Amino acid sequence: MAGSHVDMAPASTTEGTGEKPGPTAPAPTPAAQYECGECGKSFRWSSRLLHHQRTHTGERPYKCPDCPKAFKGSSALLYHQRGHTGERPYQCPDCPKAFKRSSLLQIHRSVHTGLRAFTCGQCGLAFKWSSHYQYHLRQHTGERPYPCPDCPKAFKNSSSLRRHRHVHTGERPYTCGICGKSFTQSTNLRQHQRVHTGERPFRCPLCPKTFTHSSNLLLHHRTHGPAPGPAPAPAPPGETSRADTKVLVSDAYLQPRSPPEPPAPPPQPPPVVPELFLAAAETTVELVYRCDGCEQGFSSEELLLEHQPCPGPPVATQSQDVPAELPQADSALPQPPPATPGPPNFACLPCGKSFRTVAGLSRHQHSHGAASGQAFRCGSCDGAFPQLASLLAHQQCHVEEAAAGRPPPQAEVAEVTCPQEPVAPATPAPPPPPPPAPVVSAERPYKCAECGKAFKGSSGLRYHLRDHTGERPYQCGECGKAFKRSSLLAIHQRVHTGLRAFTCGQCGLTFKWSSHYQYHLRLHSGERPYACTECGKAFRNTSCLRRHRHVHTGERPHSCSVCGKSFAQTSNLRQHQRVHTGERPFRCPLCPKTFTHSSNLLLHQRTHSAERPFACPICGRGFVMAAYLQRHLRTHTPATTTSGTTGSAVASQPPAPLAAAPTPLAAQDVHVLPNLQATLSLEVAGGTAQPTPPGPAAPSSQTFLLVQTAQGLQLIPSSVQSPTPPPPPPPPKVILLPPASAGGPGSGAARPGPRSVGKAGQGTGVVWFPGPGGLGLQGGANAGASGGGQSLIVLQNVGSGETGPQEVSGVQLQPAQEVATVQLQPAQEVTTVQLQPAQEVTTVQLQPLTGQVSNSNGGAGTTEAPNLLLVQSGATEELLTGPGPGEVGDSEAGAGVVQDVLFETLQTDEGLQSVLVLSGADGEQTRLCVQEVETLSPGLAEPAATGPSGQKLLIIRSAPATDLLENSSVAGGTTTLQLLAPSAPGPVSAPVGVPVAPPSQMVQVVPAVAGPGVMAPQNLPSIQIVQTLPAVQLVHTF
């Protein structure tokens, strides 16, 4: 900082005259008169002593009105205010640069003059600035006179202490005007602003890559490795550069080097290190200054001075040859032997371990300590030092000599070999052979002693060590979350502010973090700069590459503490731990289901929409997951079928049509039925098994099972694992009670025509439609004793108005109004229905109903015309067609007899569905979709049975459809059924003693084949199968 510079005389520890350094070293000053009582430092003037004492007291009485900064002296405040106003009154006569202080101009002039007036008496290093000279002296003495009042740390200068105090105070006075990010130093703010401006001033001389920071460029240089070609010759003494200062020079001033010449052997260690000076003719050289203590780069000396870095004086050097006429230092430095080729390193003498950087050696040697007086010995000469800092300062002379003879990409890094034994200076070493071609590998010289992880920079290792110690010094003031880096805290705070400062110029997306913004830009450009060295696969960022490398290394460093399972990424471990904790944080907004992974939620949401991205190439059916598609494709593979009478019997003569239906598609597949609360046993069989007539062969045959699973009742192939569909809403209930009494099963075929109601068997079931006409169907108690135990399929509804019954030709049904409820009541008290397993259905017949129906008040109701489709066993010879005990005249309905019943799976407008096929005598078929299977309500008791058990019950109804005709548009002709929404609640008329079913349903008749001007329905009709046997199996072959 500006207020922290104190011009000190280089020859003593007393305060200098205050004059700016001239071209030569200042002369010795008279003895000091004023001494500091805290540290013993002496000053010539009391004002200097007073200014110095504020260093110990921390007093800063001069505060800036524009920012929170305060200073110990008024002159420092004056210079600081020029930073706000932009005033720079002191301009360099050799270049266009201007400065706000005359001392800064004098310091800058040393770049052109090359003067280094301050020379260390212990190691010979020379400095341009007295503040850096004083800082360097403390490296020899180990003095750290500026302790932190909040922690045990101490620092060599006040600026380092001020920067450290920001860790405790959290002060960040410099704020970015674009994204609001704040910084402790103005130089950091300027560097950050390059993220928004896109400025990347540091270009690699070996590849087209550019960087925003010089330190990033230096790290990038390591990936190129040693440059090919012969090693350059060591520079003359006047060209020796300080290698601990990392400085880059623009490409325009990089000159080719001359062939190497063997230097003369050095007689003894050098006492003085001459410095590199730049001639005034090269005033346009753009130098980039880098702080050696914290590896931060700067574009000018002024910024570097404001930064006031940690260890290491910032000296600008060049990587190219310097003209011979440059001024030299007072004494020449004999050159050591050239460094041997190979990777340079620093060697620890006590244990022989080598390090690539001085910092690595410094950290390592702290483990040995300084037990003896001369514990730290130089590996290149016989010098020994009591402190590590003194040894490091001494080794700079060897570093400079080696750096002068290295290629430009490596010249800025202080890495040389300090051998255990001195090199014999007998004969000059021959020129080394050309080094191998550069190896592109990310060098990571900073290794963690705890886990072995390596890093490119010391800052990365420092942050990593906090993972082991648990230190998180940066805490969010909003939520209390703590972080190990201040930059991570600033990124986190955008969660509270919502600031998204990075906007894509191509698509307009905004981002909170620059890393996500850079990654997004590569989506547009297609750039994948990070390639795997094992397989060549490229990635958009380094984190993706690191995760990919686990595939080759097999590393799985993150283990579950509960079950021991290991993972390559922490995110996978967190997801796995939800298995143990039961956490399911992702909830579907349309249903109550929750999931452990967001991807599973996305897949689930497809079940609520029409999205089916995985389509079957054979039948076109879509699936929400690829796994479901693979499972479905197995159904197209030919499989062994189960032979038997079930589903295999086909009528020998083509039966008459029962009802026309839309022509089904040829594709077949499994249709999963909706949920069911009980187990079902149902076998569907045709008549007597007969040979299949010749015809086109089916594409494949498969045996299917209707089984009760944890997800509901499902119809699946016997060799395929059933999928797990989402449970649909519970279907509406329709109650159908079969007959209670039974007669012995006979073997005679059913009569083709109906008999009168009076001749029907006893114990028939009851169908009740409490609609407008109060229609009911009830078997008489004193009916004839010829067969019994019939089962009913309800096909028709009440007629409209006073219209009488109509004859049924094929199946021609009267236009329907609506049926409110369907109820079944036994002739006597029936509480339980027991069904006999596996009996064949031989005849299905459709007949009209005539006669009057009594309502609940005993009066005669309107004449209705229901059509009842009866499925009966072979033993039954009489068909029940009327609701009452009265006699009804015979009517011929032979065309309605169904000769065969079988199942198949067809493609409909609503997808693949299981279809009941009813074959008529004329060869035409009617297909009815199996929509649902239900059981009767429990709690019913069965009366004593005097005959065989009742047969299976089938209720035929249609599936929901969207394109249905209104009742007014229904014309005459063949009709099918449609189940509508429940009717409005209200009183329902019913005969005396007949219970009313709570869920009332509506039935509508629509034409199956469109007439002129009438649109045909888009869906097949459906059947509802009701069964109560507890055994579990529905097997049908098709």
From Swiss-Prot:
Keywords: DNA-binding, Metal-binding, Nucleus, Phosphoprotein, Repeat, Transcription, Transcription regulation, Zinc, Zinc-finger. It holds the Pfam family zf-C2H2. Residues 922-1038 are annotated as: Interaction with TAF4B. Expressed widely in testis, in both germline and somatic cells. Seems to have particularly strong expression in meiotic spermatocytes, postmeiotic round spermatids and Sertoli cells. Not detected in elongating spermatids or mature sperm (at protein level). Expressed in testis, ovary, spleen, lung, brain, liver and kidney. Expressed in D3 embryonic stem cells and F9 embryonal carcinoma cells. The keyword Oxidoreductase does not apply. A zinc finger (C2H2-type) spans 34-56, 62-84, 90-112, 118-140, 146-168, 174-196, 202-224, 346-368, 376-398, 446-468, 474-496, 502-524, 530-552, 558-580, 586-608, 614-636. PROSITE patterns: ZINC_FINGER_C2H2_1, ZINC_FINGER_C2H2_2. InterPro entries: Znf_C2H2-type, Znf_C2H2_sf, Znf_C2H2_type. Disruption phenotype: Viable, with no gross morphological or behavioral phenotypes. Males are infertile with complete absence of mature sperm. Spermiogenesis arrests at the round spermatid stage, accompanied by extensive apoptosis within the seminiferous tubules. Expression of spermiogenesis-associated genes TNP1, TNP2, PRM1 and PRM2 in testis is significantly reduced. The keyword Transcription applies. The modification Phosphothreonine is found at residues 197, 581. SMART domains: ZnF_C2H2. Coiled coil: none annotated. GO terms for biological process: regulation of DNA-templated transcription; spermatogenesis. Its main location: nucleus. The gene is Znf628. This is Zinc finger protein 628. Residues 227-237, 257-273, 723-733 have a biased composition (Pro residues). Residues 1-31, 220-242, 254-273, 637-661, 717-763 are annotated as: Disordered. Sequence repeats lie at residues 811-821, 822-832, 833-843, 844-854.
